[in-house]
Each structure stands twice: as structure tokens, then as C-alpha cells.
């Protein structure tokens, strides 16, 4: 039996993502194999994992068992007999804990979002700027800052402006070179408007955001030298802002004199208006054109703001020419933003464009556990799975749910259990359960790909029908709580292995095919309203 489980685990590990294998397969324990009855019993550590493994992986495990023993094997999944003892041992740790604002460290107040800053990335390449520029900048920056939301630069910052030669862009790396542990003064974060809390260390990575994180790490290590601009897009609360703050914080740790500015697009529009009203636009342009890193959030707010777009275009051109890094976020793909000048759209497309997708189940669980850990609160794993299974859209929704659970537990003096969680989130869960159905997914995909809804259930296999059907199966798996057999039944009584094949095929191709990824993003946004 142990030989079988070793071989089966190795096979499943090769088929699943590392996070899926670690979450679902590794915790399983083979209990016994009855040769006469040809029955294999496998234990799961808790009820949630038991139910999920039975619905998602039982067919594959049974297939492996039948191949191994060359017979029809009945695989039975049961709750680990020792699970109750472990749960009892954990009870003292699950007592309610006084609430803190989510995101604050124990014993520390929540940090406010800071404000704009100063100079170059690579100290070895620094050389003084011309004195005329230095004197003019110092004389005018103070005046500008009084009326416009632009920080003042001191003489050392201005004179340290770097001029970089254009190097060849290196390939994406998935590791982050550790910056020297330089002390970064709070005033630097204040001027840059970087949130010190948002770093790579506390960014939870999964299949949905791994490419975006890899690109962000590459840019942090090689600002202005690789992907420029870096354009991150995705729905609300998926981590775009976290990633760009992480890049800025990494650069500041590496060089506290780096001239960095994080700004929301709406604030940039406001600053442009103020600059014209105060007749201080030369100062405004001088500041923005001299940055080493510009992080601009939610660029879609430039829509219809023609004057702002024109000024941003010139700032963008100046920064790129100086090999300064530009990072942009938006809620949609560049070419889908309405009311933006074609010149800007083409500039956004000239760098690297990366989508951040809604987090998958395992990633949502990891996010919840990490947020709870930051609050010094113990949340049982099965509770995290319960919440993650029902709330699928974004990280902020998960954070909000965790706040409600902690508040409910604290106010009522109850331990955090699935029953308490269900009661705390009853309104939210009711709304979620009304949302996306497989039938709605089928209709949306049929309309999108111009086929009949009936084709979703038919046995027809032409590529123009089979492909949309596979995409609909993938979305049904990602966006609903249906099991593979249930999805198969709703697609004309297909076997769960057919659904599994479609899900894996589309998930794999999505990471390689930009057009498919874009189509899926549009469908997901449409279904979520």
C-alpha cells in the first residue's frame, strides 16, 4: 500500500501545480488496503479537505489504484481518526483575540499612506547634473510645492541625477536580489508616497499573479533596463497597487536617494489643473521629468482628460528617454481603455503588459491565513477553506470577510469555527450564492463566440464549438462551486475526466496565449458584472 501511495503521489505531483499538490494531496494518509474486497481507505485531515478531495481528485486516485493493482479498486475517503484529538488540542489557541486594524502589526498603529521623493538608482553611475539645472530646480521646486502636490528636492538629491546608457533587457527572473539593509528615513517614504507595509515579502503569490510578480521583481532589480513601461491590469483588489508599492520600496531600500513618486491618476489630474491655475507648470514638468521611478495607479481615470493626457505623454517620453522606469496600472487592457489618446495607448503597449487574475482557491486560502497571522489570530484551516471557497473575486473581499469574522468572534466571545463563520458572513454568502451559474457561463460563452447555447451540450466536435465549450467548462470550474462531475452533467452528461482535461488545457494555454488570456479576462469581467 505504501509503495502504491508513493508512486501515486509522485504521479499526482507531476500533474498538479505545487500549491495544489501541497494543499490537497500531501496531507492525505493511506490507512489500509483490503485485498479480498479490493478496497483502499485514504484519510483526510479535516472535513473540508475530505469533501474537496472526494469531489475533485477521487476519480484520478481511483484510476491510479486500478492501474497499480490491475483490478477494480473501490477507493474510500474518510476523516482521519486522529483529527478530533488534534482539534481538541488546538482549542485553547482558538480563543477570541482583541481586534486590531487589519494590516497593522501587533502593538503598532496603522501606517497612513505616505507622500513624493528623490534620486537615482545606481550610485556607481551617478554624476553631477549641470549647475544651471541644479540652481533652477532648487529655486523653483520650493515655490511649486507650495501650491501643487509635488515634493521639494534638496541639493544633494538634485545634483545626484543619474544618466543611464540603454542596456539590453535581461530575461525575467523569479528571484529577488536582496537589497542592502539601508535605513530609509520616514520623510523619504512620505515624499514618495510609498506605503512601507506593501512589500514583496508579504505579497502572496499564486498562479493568478505569478507572471506579474516575476515582472515586478525583474523591474525592481533592473529599473529602466528591462520592461519599460510595465503595465499591470486587472480587477479591483487583486494586488496591482501592492506590487507597484513593493517595487518602489525595494528601490528605496537599495538606494534611499532614488527619486520615486507614487501617484493615483486622479491626483495627477488634480495636480495638472493646479499647475495651470498657479502658473507653475514649468516646475511641475521639471519635477516629473526628473524622476527615477514613476508609479501611476488607475490610468483609466485619464479618460477624456485631454490636457492631462498631453502633459503625461511628454513626461512619459522624457522619463523613457532618461532610462527612468515607468509603471502603470489599470483595470483593463490598454486598447480597451476608452477616451485615451492613441499615442498613449501605443506607448503603454510598447513595454510589457501583464494581467493579474482573481486568485485561485489555494491562493485565497494562503491570503486569509497570512492576513490572520498578521493580526496574531489563529484561524483554523477549514475555516479559511470555507471562506475561500465561497468568496472568489478579490483580496479586499477576503480581507473584509476576515474582519467580519474576527469582529463577530470578538463581540460574541466565540471561537472561530465554520458555524461562527457562516453566521458572521450570512449576508455576504447569500449575495455570493446568487451570482454566477453554469447556465449563465454557457450563455455568455455562446454569445461571445457566436455559437448556439445548445452546442454546449451537444456531442459536436468542430473546433469552433469544442473550443468555446472547453472555455466554458474552465470558467465553470473557476467561478462556481460545482464539482467536476456536476459540471460534466451540465455539459450534456460528460464524464468528469473530460471536464478535467478541458480545465487543465485552458489553464495551461492561458499562461502562454495572450489572446486567449485576454478573451478569458473579458468573459470573467462580463460574468462578474
Curated annotation (Swiss-Prot):
Q: Which residues bind ATP?
A: 237, 239-241
Annotated compartments:
Cytoplasm
Q: Where is this region: Domain II?
A: 72-192
Quote the Gene3D superfamilies the UniProt record gives: 1.10.1750.10, 1.10.8.60, 3.30.300.180, P-loop containing nucleotide triphosphate hydrolases
Keywords, comma-separated and alphabetical: ATP-binding, Cytoplasm, DNA replication, DNA-binding, Lipid-binding, Nucleotide-binding
Per the entry, what this protein does is: Plays an essential role in the initiation and regulation of chromosomal replication. ATP-DnaA binds to the origin of replication (oriC) to initiate formation of the DNA replication initiation complex once per cell cycle. Binds the DnaA box (a 9 base pair repeat at the origin) and separates the double-stranded (ds)DNA. Forms a right-handed helical filament on oriC DNA; dsDNA binds to the exterior of the filament while single-stranded (ss)DNA is stabiized in the filament's interior.
Q: How does it assemble?
A: Oligomerizes as a right-handed, spiral filament on DNA at oriC.
Q: Which GO terms describe its biological process?
A: DNA replication initiation; regulation of DNA replication
Keyword set includes Cytoplasm: yes
Recorded family membership = Belongs to the DnaA family.
Q: Under the cellular component aspect of Gene Ontology, which terms does the record hold?
A: cytoplasm; plasma membrane
What coarse category fits the chief subcellular location reported for this protein?
Answer: cytoplasm
| GO molecular function ontology, one term from the record | lipid binding
What's the name of the protein?
Chromosomal replication initiator protein DnaA
Amino acid at each position: 500500500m505504501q509503495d502504491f501511495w508513493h508512486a501515486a503521489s509522485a504521479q499526482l505531483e507531476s500533474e498538479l501545480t505545487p500549491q495544489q499538490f501541497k494543499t490537497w494531496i500531501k496531507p492525505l494518509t493511506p490507512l489500509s488496503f483490503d485485498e479480498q474486497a479490493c478496497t483502499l481507505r485514504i484519510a483526510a485531515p479535516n472535513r473540508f479537505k475530505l469533501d474537496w478531495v472526494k469531489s475533485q481528485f477521487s476519480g484520478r486516485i481511483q484510476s491510479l489504484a486500478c492501474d497499480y493493482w490491475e483490478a477494480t479498486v473501490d477507493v474510500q475517503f474518510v476523516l482521519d481518526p486522529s483529527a478530533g484529538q488534534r482539534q481538541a488540542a488546538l482549542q485553547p489557541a482558538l480563543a477570541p483575540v482583541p481586534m486590531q486594524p487589519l494590516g497593522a502589526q501587533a502593538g503598532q498603529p496603522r501606517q497612513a499612506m505616505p507622500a513624493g521623493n528623490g534620486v537615482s538608482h545606481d550610485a556607481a553611475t551617478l554624476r553631477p547634473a549641470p549647475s544651471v539645472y541644479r540652481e533652477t530646480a532648487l529655486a523653483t521646486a520650493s515655490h511649486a510645492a507650495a501650491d501643487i502636490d509635488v515634493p521639494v528636492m534638496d541639493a544633494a538629491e538634485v545634483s545626484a541625477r543619474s544618466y543611464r546608457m540603454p542596456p539590453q533587457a535581461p530575461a525575467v527572473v523569479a528571484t529577488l536580489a536582496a537589497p542592502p539593509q539601508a535605513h530609509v528615513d520616514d520623510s523619504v517614504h512620505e515624499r514618495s508616497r510609498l506605503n512601507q507595509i506593501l512589500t514583496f515579502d508579504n505579497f502572496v503569490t499564486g498562479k493568478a499573479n505569478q507572471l506579474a510578480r516575476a515582472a515586478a521583481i525583474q523591474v525592481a532589480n533592473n529599473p529602466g533596463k528591462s520592461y519599460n513601461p510595465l503595465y499591470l491590469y486587472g480587477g479591483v483588489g487583486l494586488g496591482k497597487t501592492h506590487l507597484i508599492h513593493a517595487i518602489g520600496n525595494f528601490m528605496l531600500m537599495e538606494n534611499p536617494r532614488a527619486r520615486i513618486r507614487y501617484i493615483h491618476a486622479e491626483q495627477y489630474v488634480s495636480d495638472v489643473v493646479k499647475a495651470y491655475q498657479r502658473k507653475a507648470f514649468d516646475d511641475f514638468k521639471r519635477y516629473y521629468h526628473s524622476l527615477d521611478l514613476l508609479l501611476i495607479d488607475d490610468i483609466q481615470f485619464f479618460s477624456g482628460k485631454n490636457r492631462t493626457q498631453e502633459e503625461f505623454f511628454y513626461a512619459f517620453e522624457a522619463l523613457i528617454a532618461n532610462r527612468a522606469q515607468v509603471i502603470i496600472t489599470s483595470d483593463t487592457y490598454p486598447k480597451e481603455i476608452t477616451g485615451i489618446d492613441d499615442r498613449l495607448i501605443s506607448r503603454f503597449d510598447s513595454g510589457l503588459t501583464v494581467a493579474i487574475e482573481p486568485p485561485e482557491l489555494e491562493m485565497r486560502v494562503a491570503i486569509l491565513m497570512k492576513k490572520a497571522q498578521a493580526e496574531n489570530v489563529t484561524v483554523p484551516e477549514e475555516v479559511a477553506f470555507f471562506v475561500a471557497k465561497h468568496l472568489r473575486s478579490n483580496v479586499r473581499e477576503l480581507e473584509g470577510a476576515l474582519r467580519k469574522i474576527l469582529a463577530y468572534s470578538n463581540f460574541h466571545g466565540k471561537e472561530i469555527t465554520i458555524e461562527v463563520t457562516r453566521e458572521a458572513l450570512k449576508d455576504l454568502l447569500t449575495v455570493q450564492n446568487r451570482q454566477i451559474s453554469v447556465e449563465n457561463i454557457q450563455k455568455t460563452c455562446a454569445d461571445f463566440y457566436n455559437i448556439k447555447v445548445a452546442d454546449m451540450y451537444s456531442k459536436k466536435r468542430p473546433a469552433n464549438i469544442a473550443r468555446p465549450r472547453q472555455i466554458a467548462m474552465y470558467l465553470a470550474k473557476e467561478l462556481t462551486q460545482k464539482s467536476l462531475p456536476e459540471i460534466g452533467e451540465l455539459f450534456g452528461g460528460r464524464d468528469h475526466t473530460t471536464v478535467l482535461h478541458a480545465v487543465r488545457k485552458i489553464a495551461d494555454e492561458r499562461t502562454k496565449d495572450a489572446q486567449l488570456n485576454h478573451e478569458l479576462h473579458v468573459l470573467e469581467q462580463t460574468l462578474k458584472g
